[in-house]
């Protein structure tokens, strides 16, 4: 197994990392907690699976909006990232639904720009590339 770490941006944290795992001709990229960054797209070069965190919906106030946009990736932004990265499978995890959304709306928002397969992961799910 080859493991490659790459820098991501998670708000005010000085260091935050994503990871790419390569083994037996398959590759998985895990974003970690991050706002949209090009390093995720670059790490996905030819990847089988992108596992990425996401929030969807509208923050309730300006403070929450600033927090989410600095620390996390919206469903719309994730769609753009996945469209550029072109993973064979997008796995959504660490899903934060805000007040005016649900899982179906989140997937719909991602599919506005990414037209590939999406799995919404739950704790303890086992998903193979």
Positions of predicted regions on the chain:
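Metallo-beta-lactamase
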Residues: 1-15, 119
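Beta-strand-turn-beta hairpins that frame and shape the catalytic cleft
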Residues: 1-3, 23-28
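Conserved Rossmann-like nucleotide-binding pocket used by diverse enzymes
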Residues: 4, 30, 91
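Short, well-ordered turn and helix-capping elements at secondary-structure junctions
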Residues: 7-9, 32-34, 38
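A short acidic, often aromatic-flanked loop/helix-cap motif at beta-alpha or helix-coil junctions
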Residues: 11, 125-129
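Cap/insert and terminal regions of metallo-dependent hydrolase folds
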Residues: 18, 25-27, 35-125
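Conserved hydrophobic "DFG−1" position in protein kinase catalytic cores
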Residues: 20-21, 129
């Amino acid at each position: 197994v080859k493991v490659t770490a790459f820098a991501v941006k998670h708000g005010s944290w000085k260091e935050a990392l994503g990871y790419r795992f390569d083994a037996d001709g398959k590759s998985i990229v895990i974003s970690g907690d991050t706002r949209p960054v090009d390093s995720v797209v670059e790490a996905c070069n030819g990847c089988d699976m992108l596992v990425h965190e996401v929030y969807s919906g509208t923050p309730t106030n300006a403070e929450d909006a600033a927090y989410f946009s600095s620390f996390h990736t919206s469903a719309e932004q994730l769609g753009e990232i996945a469209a550029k990265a072109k993973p064979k499978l997008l796995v959504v995890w660490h899903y934060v639904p805000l007040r005016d959304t649900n899982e179906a709306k989140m997937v719909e928002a991602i599919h506005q720009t990414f037209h590939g397969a999406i799995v919404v992961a739950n704790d303890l799910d086992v998903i193979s590339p």
